[in-house]
Amino acid sequence: IVGGTNAPRGKYPYQVSLRAPKHFCGGSISKRYVLTAAHCLVGKSEHQVTVGSVLLNKEEAVYNAKELIVNKNYNSIRLINDIGLIRVSKDISFTQLVQPVKLPVSNTIKAGDPVVLTGWGRIYVNGPIPNNLQQITLSIVNQQTCKSKHWGLTDSQICTFTKRGEGACHGDSGGPLVANGVQIGIVSYGHPCAIGSPNVFTRVYSFLDWIQKNQL
């Protein structure tokens, strides 16, 4: 995240770091699954999921990936249907610092709404990965404005923007975009990084059926 601040311990108990063996993507958790971006899973086999800590160098609990589930309509050229699940080898044990994320029950998010993005992505292009989880408040951008910058945009995607110098960067992919404690987006792509163009997220609401079907 470019332009963010250090997240306090325990504020985002659903946020996880995917490692192979170093941090490469974010994700969010349910009892047995991690929700992330498809592009974080393609071509990877050894995944570990680290939960419960805002510091990368302080591992609270680590779970091994048992199965990687990529949405079969994921298109790596157009970057659509960029959603995936990791089934971990055992149930994630919940504590004060480890909690499942809530998923949306309706598609009520609209342009101008404030949303919170968290992640351990780079703090500028080719910059370092921060040790402390970063947080930033962004705004939802209307689809037309976003389409003018990302022509292939579909209704199953959603965009954010605030100003130049704020936004997602490499390593934030797969991480959660949250409105009022409900995850509405998954970090998908953007023009790297924070150069004044909207970030694009997979719209979680559009994939609720897929998520349910695949969390067996």
UniProtKB/Swiss-Prot annotation:
Alphabetical list of SMART domains matching this protein: Tryp_SPc
Record keywords: Disulfide bond, Hydrolase, Protease, Secreted, Serine protease
Pfam families: Trypsin
Origin: domain of life: Eukaryota
CDD domains given in the database record: Tryp_SPc
Sequence ranges assigned to domain Peptidase S1 in this UniProt record: 1-216
A cellular component annotation (GO) from this entry: extracellular region
Disulfide feature: C25-C40, C146-C159, C169-C193
Reactions catalysed, as given in the entry: Preferential cleavage: Tyr-|-Xaa, Trp-|-Xaa, Phe-|-Xaa, Leu-|-Xaa
Chief site of localization: secreted
Family: Belongs to the peptidase S1 family.
Name this polypeptide is given: Chymotrypsin-2
Lineage: Eukaryota, Metazoa, Ecdysozoa, Arthropoda, Hexapoda
